[in-house]
Amino acid sequence: MRVTLFDYGAGNLHSLAKALAGDGADVRLERDPAATLATDVLVLPGVGAFGPAAAALAPARERVRDALAAGLPCLAICLGMQLLFDGSDEGPGLGVGLVPGRVRALRARRVPHMGWNEVRPAGDGAAAPALALPPIAYFAHSFACAPDDDRGVTAWTTHEDDRFPAAVRVANTVGVQFHPEKSSAAGVAFLRGLLAGVRARAGARGSARP
């Protein structure tokens, strides 16, 4: 199974690539946003700032949105989750627009939000068991997603008195504000559960063919 990380050119993606490859996936880095779509799983990583990342994504923004809306499996981490939204107060440029809403600055005295925090499932919208979220995960960010409505939110977290989505899901796209690759064994289990779910769906489609 091919897993492609979109490289915005902003940092070292080694730890994330290593965590994904540990499950036997063929992990590749790609700087051409259009080329990232020739994959089984697209990963929008959590390294960088919104403006430069949006600029890197811009040449294929609509193609990426259409592919995700059509069901291409995608994992979007931290900044990557923020890129699923329409735009951000952090910088110029457009996000993918898969999730209606914007990204805003954290409303907290201590910014950035760095360290371990709880991930609380959002009741009826909680992720399926194959995508069990870690109960505690590692966060590192100064901006948070503000969806127009909560239907796609699968988990929440709170920093001081500021509550915001810890995870969202639309079609086969899962966005998480935390860093799974930095969230110990539970984070790695989340990554492997996501890849296992993609494999299972692909296998089911294959067995259903005449």
Stretch-by-stretch model annotation:
Residues 48-117:
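Cysteine-nucleophile active-site neighborhood
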Residues 145-210:
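C-terminal and late-domain segments of enzyme folds
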